[in-house]
């Protein structure tokens, strides 16, 4: 794969660091290091990594340091720096203004002749789909923890996502220069809260204001970071006062790795002293198996500990050939039988191309599609096929992205991440170079939205801009849903949280010149039944000529609490009372009828429709008959069932000074929260609670006022559970008032 010419790279200000900084490393020659003796970079020289963490742990600052030390950018800027430039990876104007990452940004760089593709992801729970997409296509990751905050609620979400996609990772405990930093506590939380077999690879030399450098436990040496920007790495003897601690921690590291690696375990039992290379190989094997997590230390803001972390990425994280990726082969005869096929990671054209579109974006270059290549070769000018739409696409342009800038390339191979232009597709689509191959990569896990608001443009003349912007956002973000409420004649948008929807409202105004009016947030309640209920329903329609006839018998069952968001259909029929070609029609009728519940108009979920028997007519039975029979059977069962309303419960984490503990606990109790745990460090306490989302609106204002602006909180979706009787009554009454079945109470405006 070629880059732009050397002159173009120089024009972009890449590949060179100012001589005045006393840079001690060789200048990176981008053009030269794109090639090996065979003409293509081997897999061993590639790493695809993501940087993920809780909000404000320092992910973007860390990425900025990585780009600077590898010669990718000539000057560093802070996320909320005084120069107003903002970090390179925060390319959206809104990101620079707020100092948070909203979209994943992709870039690539070089470290010690290895190509590193990096995706910097958001930490805020509302943008969790960006993290989900990044981890799906990466081979390894760096989990960033704050030395003060430790393991926080979004850290646990990222940990679950890494587990889902089996991503090996390193941990970097950042912000050792901050007051109250406690890396030992963060490590303990990794072991207790995340259940990781983790150990320090380094120990700090001083903490907070006295943080001078780190001690490398593998090589048994001290590492200092000199120069104005920490760019000169200097090695020295371990200070005398830290030698005993370094010996103890090194022994603990060997024990942890020996517990998860058989070869090192045997050496440990035989009381042999492992060499440095033995230890490194054992750590690599255990990290790739996800049975051990190496923990590194530093402070990205103070430019300490970043270069050893880069060395560790090369040393311990997998290259594309060490990760097994599977595609699903769907049979063409419409059978539900699926076969898993292992992708070949060879960097040549000996196998057909397979790639996954994991992110869509409309930038200044038009529609951008980010694709991870899993197999084969893709060249500029090639024709590829979208296996979902069965459409051919010719590639006019192929590029690699650096935040919002791009560099054209001629070809990409398995293991590369690239951007395609002007391609009509959806996030999660699979591309191949053979028509009707039936291959698809496992799709990205998309969580359901939990909050909705009504939205309309302030000016009626902006309707075209509004629909254009909303259409683009729904293509880019699968967690952002839009529908038109026919009863209230309004457009309703749904997403993962208030911030998520607020950001889209602001983007409509900034990017499309369409200011919007938003209504009050609405929670995505669900309805379900509390006990099994039988049904026996016949749909009959005779109006002269061919009629409609379908009979279904069975039982409607509630699902277990962990499956409250699901709907299941089970066919337990025998014989030919209901011909098999009509069973999918019954399922469709059931699913269609679940869109609106009888109690409050919200969706039905947590149900299993068990079809046991039925009847058909030789002439009058058809697909529509059994769709209507499925709908009628559900309505009949619900009329005889006891229903309850389910509400989303959020896992809330509040951090505030100790003197406000009483007020914070009282506030959570008032909001019907259940306190699940408590932590304390220095003068601050952390409260963990499960609180209904419906009761969390306006909490940020209350928390600020009761803690004098010193408290902060984060929350993420946890589960659905039956709501309180008072909440259920309130939700039902609001629905009856809105539909005119109940008079609106005096002094209360109709919602």
Curated annotation (Swiss-Prot):
Keywords: Acetylation, Elongation factor, GTP-binding, Hydrolase, Mitochondrion, Nucleotide-binding, Phosphoprotein, Primary mitochondrial disease, Protein biosynthesis, Transit peptide. Pathway: Protein biosynthesis; polypeptide chain elongation. GTP binds at residues 53-60, 120-124, 174-177. Its EC number is 3.6.5.-. The modification Phosphoserine is found at residue 91. GO terms for biological process: mitochondrial translational elongation. The modification N6-acetyllysine is found at residue 175. GO terms for cellular component: mitochondrial matrix; mitochondrion. It catalyses: GTP + H2O = GDP + phosphate + H(+). GO terms for molecular function: GTP binding; GTPase activity; RNA binding; translation elongation factor activity. Residues 1-36 form a transit peptide. Pfam families: EFG_C, EFG_III, EFG_IV, GTP_EFTU, GTP_EFTU_D2. Residues 44-321 form the tr-type G domain. It comes from the Eukaryota. It is an enzyme of class 3 (hydrolase). It is found in: Mitochondrion. It is linked to Combined oxidative phosphorylation deficiency 1: A mitochondrial disease resulting in early rapidly progressive hepatoencephalopathy. PANTHER family: ELONGATION FACTOR G, MITOCHONDRIAL. HAMAP family: EF_G_EF_2_B. Mitochondrial GTPase that catalyzes the GTP-dependent ribosomal translocation step during translation elongation. During this step, the ribosome changes from the pre-translocational (PRE) to the post-translocational (POST) state as the newly formed A-site-bound peptidyl-tRNA and P-site-bound deacylated tRNA move to the P and E sites, respectively. Catalyzes the coordinated movement of the two tRNA molecules, the mRNA and conformational changes in the ribosome. Does not mediate the disassembly of ribosomes from messenger RNA at the termination of mitochondrial protein biosynthesis. Belongs to the TRAFAC class translation factor GTPase superfamily. Classic translation factor GTPase family. EF-G/EF-2 subfamily. This is Elongation factor G, mitochondrial. The lineage of its organism: Eukaryota, Metazoa, Chordata, Craniata, Vertebrata.
């Amino acid at each position: 794969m070629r880059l732009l010419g050397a002159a173009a790279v120089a024009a972009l200000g890449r590949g060179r660091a100012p001589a005045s900084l006393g840079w001690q490393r060789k200048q990176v020659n981008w053009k030269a290091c794109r090639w090996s003796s065979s003409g293509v970079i081997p897999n061993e020289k590639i790493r695809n990594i993501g940087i993920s963490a809780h909000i404000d742990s320092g992910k973007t600052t860390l990425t900025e340091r990585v780009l600077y030390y590898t010669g990718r950018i000539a000057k560093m800027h802070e996320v909320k720096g005084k120069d107003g430039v903002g970090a390179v990876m925060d390319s959206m104007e809104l990101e620079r203004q707020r100092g948070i990452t909203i979209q994943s940004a992709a870039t690539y760089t070089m470290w010690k002749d290895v190509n590193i593709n990096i995706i910097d992801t958001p930490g805020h729970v509302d943008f969790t789909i960006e993290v989900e997409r990044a981890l799906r296509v990466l081979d390894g990751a760096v989990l960033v923890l704050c030395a003060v905050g430790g393991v926080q609620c979004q850290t646990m979400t990222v940990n679950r996502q890494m587990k889902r996609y089996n991503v090996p990772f390193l941990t970097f405990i950042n912000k050792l220069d901050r007051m109250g930093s406690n890396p030992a506590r963060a490590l303990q939380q990794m072991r207790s809260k995340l259940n990781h077999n983790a150990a320090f690879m380094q120990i700090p030399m001083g903490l907070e204001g006295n943080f001078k450098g780190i001690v490398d436990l593998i090589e048994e040496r001290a590492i200092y970071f000199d120069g104005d920007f920490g760019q000169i790495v200097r090695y020295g003897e371990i200070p005398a006062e830290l030698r005993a601690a370094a010996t103890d921690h090194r022994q603990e590291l060997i024990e942890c790795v020996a517990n998860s690696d058989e070869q090192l375990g045997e050496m440990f039992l035989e009381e042999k002293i492992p060499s440095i290379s033995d230890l490194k190989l054992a750590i690599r094997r255990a990290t790739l198996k996800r049975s051990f997590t190496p923990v590194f230390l530093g402070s990205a803001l103070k430019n300490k500990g970043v270069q050893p972390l880069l060395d560790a990425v090369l040393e311990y994280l997998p290259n594309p050939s060490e990760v097994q990726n599977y595609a699903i082969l769907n049979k063409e005869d419409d059978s539900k039988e699926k076969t898993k096929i292992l992708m070949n990671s060879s960097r040549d054209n000996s196998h057909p191309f397979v790639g996954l579109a994991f992110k869509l974006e409309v930038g200044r270059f038009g529609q951008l599609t980010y694709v991870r290549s899993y197999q084969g070769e893709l060249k500029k000018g090639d024709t590829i096929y979208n296996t979902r739409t069965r459409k051919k696409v010719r590639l006019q342009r192929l590029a690699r992205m650096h935040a919002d800038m791009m560099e054209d390339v001629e070809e990409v191979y398995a293991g590369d991440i690239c951007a395609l232009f002007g391609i009509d597709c959806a996030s999660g689509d699979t591309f191949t170079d053979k028509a009707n191959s039936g291959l698809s990569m496992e799709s990205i896990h998309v969580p359901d939205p939990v909050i909705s608001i009504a939205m309309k443009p302030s000016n009626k003349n902006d309707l075209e801009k509004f629909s254009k912007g909303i259409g683009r956002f729904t293509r880019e973000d699968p967690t952002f849903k839009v529908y038109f409420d026919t009863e209230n004649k309004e457009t309703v948008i749904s997403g993962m949280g208030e911030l998520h929807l607020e950001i889209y409202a602001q983007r409509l105004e900034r990017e499309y010149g369409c200011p919007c009016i938003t209504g009050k947030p609405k929670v995505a309640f669900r309805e379900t039944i509390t006990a099994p209920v039988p049904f026996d329903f016949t749909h009959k329609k005779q109006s002269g000529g061919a009629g409609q006839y379908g009979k279904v018998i069975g039982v409607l069952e509630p699902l277990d609490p962990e499956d409250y968001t699901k709907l299941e259909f089970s066919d337990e029929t025998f014989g030919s009372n209901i011909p098999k070609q009509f069973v999918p029609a019954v399922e469709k009728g059931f699913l269609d009828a679940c869109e609106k519940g009888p109690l409050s108009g919200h969706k039905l979920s947590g149900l299993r429709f068990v079809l046991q028997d039925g009847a058909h007519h030789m002439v009058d039975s058809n697909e529509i008959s059994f769709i209507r029979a499925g709908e009628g059977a559900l309505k009949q069962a619900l009329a005889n069932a006891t229903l309850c309303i389910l509400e989303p419960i959020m896992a809330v984490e509040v951090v505030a000074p100790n003197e406000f503990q009483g007020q914070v606990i009282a506030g959570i109790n008032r909001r019907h929260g259940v306190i699940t745990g408590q932590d304390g460090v220095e003068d601050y306490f952390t409260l963990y609670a499960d609180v209904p989302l419906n009761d969390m609106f306006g909490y940020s204002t209350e928390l600020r006022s009761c803690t004098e602006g010193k408290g902060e909180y984060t929350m993420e979706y946890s589960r659905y559970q039956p709501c309180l009787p008072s909440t259920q009554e309130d939700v039902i009454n609001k629905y009856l008032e809105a539909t005119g079945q109940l008079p609106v109470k005096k002094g209360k405006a109709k919602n």
